[in-house]
Amino acid sequence: MGRRSANSSGFSLIELLVSLAVGALVIGSAVQIFTRGLNATFVVSQRAQMQQDLRATSDLLFKDLSLAGAGLPSATGILLPSAAGRPIYGFAPSCVAKNNCIPGGGIAYPCTSVAAVPCNPTLYGLIPGWQLGITVPGSPNRSDVVTVVYTDTVFALPCYTIQAITATTVIVQLPAPLPATCILTPPLVAPQAVNAPAVGLTPGDLVLVQSTVGGNSATVIAEVTGVAANGGGNYTVTFAGGDTLNMNQPGAPAASLTQLVCGPAPAAACPATASTTRIFATSYYLWMLPDPLGVGAGTPTLMRQVNGQTPVPVQEGVVNLQFTYDTYGPTGALLNAVGDGGYSTGTSFNLIRKINVVHLTTRSQVSGAKSGLMTTNGYQTFDTQTSISARNLSYQNRYVVAP
């Protein structure tokens, strides 16, 4: 009787199950390693992007803070008009249309002193805004606002001579030859046109007008509402009332262009020393960028507003902005880390000597804690702290260049 040979082709059921289990284990391990690698890459790339964003923000903010008061003629502040209400800064002109304005419509310029009656609004080179900002969701405290003011050294507006000043206009002329006081920033070979598209005056700009009244120097700050070219290097700059920042008040008894009225020559020529200079009043504050889907509270965003121009976002995801200031009290005592810059004690903002950035905090907008690089799930956060010298606030130019 013949012997039947067993069929050895294929796998048994047990062998098939074992091979499937081993294959699933190998593939699962590979997928897990790949997922961990992707998560680690995401965390690292997100962290690098946050660092880059914060570095760019810090460069812009810290440079502005270091320029506080640069080029301003007075170390004691510049008086502003108040007959039609106090001028404002920050959150304008789009405050009403956008949420989280503190207070609604803008922040009024501070008085010369907290106890001054009546209030004389004054522009300083540095204006602290302690707890005048929004409260970011999840934060226990209000954020701060900070405003710095300095002159524009690129736009050669001081090279123009003033031909006439009325209550609402200033007429300037480009002289030939240029006066000795005309300083051009390289590579400029001639002053730019007053209405030049890139650097010229536009509505919302602030102009510092200096002249002489009764033998005494006088300074007025006005907001540009229009610029017209008259030909031959002659321009009419309009400072009409009802401006965004409430700077133009023709009927004010002080600190308005009405007190500087002069020209045209030869009947009532303007002083040869009269000049115009553009200044930058730059405010930083936090604002909640609305959720495009209208679902969440929005994204906390650091905003930057220059003069009366539309505010622009600097960086999204900034959740805290706080400052303190080192200054001197009325008796000369050193006050360290004061939130309001000593304003509540009657101290002038021009006595501030150091700006302390207590918190400039940025947070990731998407959870980045997805790998072993982070101990718990959550958001990545960076907090910047530094101090900046306010060296220009106490500077006074004792040397006047004759025209």
Could you say what each language-model-derived stretch is?
Residues 15, 42, 54, 176:
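Solvent-exposed, flexible loop/coil residues
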Residues 1-6:
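N-terminal secretory signal peptides that target proteins for export/translocation
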Residues 8, 39, 45-49, 53-60, ...:
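Short linear sequence signals and composition-biased patches located at protein termini or domain-edge surfaces
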Residues 7-34, 46:
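N-terminal single-pass transmembrane signal-anchor helix
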Residues 119-247:
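Autoprocessing Asn-cyclization modules and mimics
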Residues 20, 28, 37, 69, ...:
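Glycine-rich, histidine-containing beta strand-loop boundary motifs that form or position
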